[in-house]
Regions:
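NAD(P)-binding Rossmann-fold cofactor-contacting core
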Residues: 176-199
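Conserved S-adenosyl-L-methionine
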Residues: 173-178, 267-270
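Short glycine-rich anion-binding loops that position phosphate/pyrophosphate groups of nucleotides
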Residues: 93-100, 162-163, 226-229, 254
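Phosphate/diphosphate ligand-binding glycine-rich loop within oxidoreductases
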Residues: 16, 21-146
Length: 304
């Protein structure tokens, strides 16, 4: 699909009139508008629709990003309906759908096959659908942009679900020294460890309790679980045993500063906010969706 599809310099012929009317930036959707959806449940905390919509409006892209609150029970039916709409070009998945979405892809990127979940699905020429997962790539780029050193790092990852699995696999492709995994569902942690061992020789440990056997050697501690979304949630792990140089990262975007990050800051530790992952994954996702030429990433701020 050409870039002009997404720009609002499209002219439309008005029935019964001879002049051409240029579509206004704030005009409602028209018959040429391309649609993208974000599937999640709950969806209220997800920042991506606001950020994508802001960019689409700023750069006059004739496209809409629509949030869809879809629970697991209705997921397959809802996604099948969306895929059946000819003017839908892509879908983004957040919790809890990243594993379930895989079977809806006709083609998977090599990265998605290794990770075992997807957060992006796009319509290809001919009508087939391709899945990819850019969460981990966005996290790694964001961490590096924040000045956090990964080479030789000891990393603790709390949560091995859809986003955790992507982050864990992506970190293992970097030159880290050790990766400790924990999930309340131990089978998910062991499954991620096994997937990583197929592609990396990094030292991997599966912890039997939150925080792992010894946090005193941890350089980067990451929460990739839902803990912190809701007020009153328990901390995913204690920051008390982390060394003074450690960095604490959270993938949760709203609230921006979670209880875990508050505790880490109070303990004098550097923190890394969840919105960094989205901000650095967006250019990759835009390219995947064919929108990269519609946005000026050099001049765009994607702060959510």
């Amino acid at each position: 699909m050409t870039n002009t599809t997404y720009r609002e310099n499209i002219s439309m012929s008005v029935s019964g009139d001879t002049h051409m009317e240029r579509l206004r930036l704030d005009a409602p959707a028209d018959a040429l508008t391309r649609l993208f959806f974000i599937f999640g449940s709950p969806i209220a905390h997800v920042r991506a629709p606001v950020v994508w919509s802001t960019l689409m409006k700023r750069y006059s892209a004739n496209a809409l990003m629509l949030p869809a609150d879809v629970d697991a029970e209705r997921f397959d039916t809802a996604l099948a309906g969306v895929k059946g709409m000819a003017n839908v070009d892509g879908v983004i998945f957040t919790m809890p759908h990243k594993f379930a979405a895989m079977k809806h892809a006709d083609v998977l990127s090599a990265r998605a096959r290794r990770i075992g979940s997807i957060n992006l699905l796009r319509r290809r020429a001919g009508g087939s659908w391709e899945g990819d997962n850019v969460d981990g790539a966005g996290f790694v780029v964001g961490v590096r942009a924040d000045g956090i050193r990964l080479q030789g790092a000891h990393v603790y990852l709390h949560g091995c679900g859809g986003v955790g699995r992507s982050i864990g696999w992506s970190l293992a492709m970097e030159d880290i020294a050790r990766l400790t995994l924990f999930d309340l569902d131990a089978t998910r942690a062991h499954a991620l460890a096994e997937a990583i061992r197929q592609d990396s020789k990094v030292r991997i440990e599966v912890a039997t309790k939150a925080g792992g056997p010894d946090m005193r050697e941890t350089d980067l501690a990451i929460n990739a679980s839902p803990l912190g979304l809701n007020a009153g949630d328990a901390l995913p792990f204690s920051v008390d045993r982390l060394p003074p140089h450690a960095v604490v990262a959270d993938v949760i975007m709203d609230p921006r500063t979670t209880a875990l990050l508050h505790a880490a800051s109070a303990h004098g530790l550097k923190v890394h906010h969840g919105r960094n992952m989205m901000n650095h994954a967006m250019p990759v996702a835009a390219s995947f969706f064919g929108l990269d030429d519609a946005f000026d990433w050099n001049g765009a701020s994607v702060q959510g």
